[in-house]
């Protein structure tokens, strides 16, 4: 699916897992109703949560389970507007629960379909989580100006001017021997020497 930048938050792939399946189910159900095709009815039955009605896991709670099945994708879609990674996680969790229930109840067709959807949602969650970690790492390491001392220590430094005392740079109240000065990610060279040093990338 190719979406514009403005629609990217509303047309998220994770919600399509639910909505596309529900849409196809509804259209197939209408088609079967118009043609009286019992085999199509059975096929649809095997691919919806109705298949779990006869299992021990759901037989006593089918009514609220159906309501949850309908409302769950709505909630996750709304959640995706502000918390996309979290909504992917809940998609994988919900689809995985239905798949597990189908497997335990011996409904292997239902289990395989929802298991594939759960896996796709989980992959989306992993991708989003990895991107979030990369963004967090960049946010914490975006400083490009720093000083490397002779012991390999890295000290953040914003100014191109370094004040020396006794041949050492004063950083945070401590005196360190400068090995390299990096400005905007580039190794700098001393420009002028006075009572202080000015470095230029």
From Swiss-Prot:
Principal subcellular localisation of the protein: virion
Gene name tied to this protein: GP5
Q: Output the PTM entry.
A: N-glycosylated.
* Compartment(s) where it occurs, according to its Swiss-Prot or TrEMBL record: Virion membrane
Topological domains on the Virion surface side lie at 33-63
Function in brief = Major envelope protein present in abundant amounts in the virion envelope. Mediates virion sialic acid-dependent attachment the sialoadhesin receptor SIGLEC1. This attachment induces virion internalization into alveolar macrophages predominantly through clathrin-dependent endocytosis.
Glycan attachment sites:
37-38, 46, 53
| Alphabetically ordered keywords of this record | Clathrin-mediated endocytosis of virus by host, Disulfide bond, Glycoprotein, Host-virus interaction, Membrane, Signal, Transmembrane, Transmembrane helix, Viral attachment to host cell, Viral envelope protein, Viral penetration into host cytoplasm, Virion, Virus endocytosis by host, Virus entry into host cell
The record, for Pfam families, names: Arteri_Gl
The family note in this entry says: Belongs to the arteriviridae GP5 protein family.
State how it assembles: Heterodimer with the membrane protein; disulfide-linked. This heterodimerization is required for transport to the Golgi complex. Interacts with host SIGLEC1; this interaction plays a role in virus entry into host cell. Interacts with glycoprotein 4.
Q: Which residues form the signal peptide?
A: 1-32
Offer a single GO CC term for the protein: viral envelope
Q: Where are the transmembrane segments?
A: 64-84, 109-129
Q: Does the keyword Transmembrane apply?
A: yes
The protein's topology relative to the membrane is: Multi-pass membrane protein
Which processes are annotated in GO (biological process)? Answer: clathrin-dependent endocytosis of virus by host cell; virion attachment to host cell
Name of the protein this chain belongs to: Glycoprotein 5
């Amino acid at each position: 699916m190719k979406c514009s930048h403005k629609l990217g938050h509303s047309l998220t792939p994770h919600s399509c897992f639910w909505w596309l399946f529900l849409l196809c189910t509804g259209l197939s159900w209408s088609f079967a109703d118009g043609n009286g095709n019992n085999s199509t009815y059975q096929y649809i039955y095997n691919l919806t949560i109705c298949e779990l009605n006869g299992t021990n896991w759901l037989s006593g709670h089918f009514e609220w389970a159906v309501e949850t099945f309908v409302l769950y994708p709505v909630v996750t879609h709304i959640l995706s507007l502000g918390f996309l990674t979290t909504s992917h996680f809940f998609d994988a969790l919900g689809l995985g629960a239905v798949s597990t229930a189908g497997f335990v109840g011996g409904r292997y067709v239902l289990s395989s379909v929802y298991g594939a959807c759960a896996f796709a949602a989980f992959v989306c969650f992993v991708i989003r989580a990895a991107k979030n970690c990369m963004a967090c790492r960049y946010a914490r390491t975006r400083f490009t100006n720093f000083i490397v001392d002779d012991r390999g220590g890295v000290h953040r430094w914003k100014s191109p001017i370094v004040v020396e005392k006794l041949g050492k740079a004063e950083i945070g109240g401590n005196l360190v021997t400068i090995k390299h000065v990096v400005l905007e990610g580039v190794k700098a060279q001393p420009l002028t020497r006075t009572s202080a040093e000015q470095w230029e990338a």
